[in-house]
Amino acid sequence: MKFIILILSICSVLVGQGTRYIDEVFEEVIKTEDVIYGNAPDLPFWFWVESNTVDIDLDMDIYEPADDTALVRPVIIFLHTGAFFSGHNELDDVVDLAISAAKRGYSAISMNYRLGLNVLSTYSAERAVFRAVQDGSAVIRYLREYSELYN
């Protein structure tokens, strides 16, 4: 009987703590801007040949809840829209999603990825997706390497 009361007491405490990650429990968010997570060859905006590249720094913005005592938080990575042709990580919808996730207790990442799509090329769309996946993998590698710095 004592064991059942102990289990029920623990469950009632856990149920009361369950709103983190669901409801916005933090008022303020800390934003770390323009964190460089890599460097890669990029295509100019208007291109006809995919061998014409320029190296660029790849950056992201990190949103974290202010005054959070958790040492480890789950991470959500947001990518902007734009069909691999346009966009950046400071578009209003991506920023709003990242702030909302950080207020719920997550670490939220809004990342830039390499753009470039030649509608006249049959392989350009596949290569654009491949570059974005590579950039997403680079963000994950960076976050794993510097996890102690960014929680």
Place the predicted regions along the sequence by residue:
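Serine-hydrolase catalytic-loop signature spanning alpha/beta hydrolases and amidase-signature enzymes
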Residues: 83-86, 108, 142
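Short beta-strand element of the alpha/beta-hydrolase
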Residues: 71-83
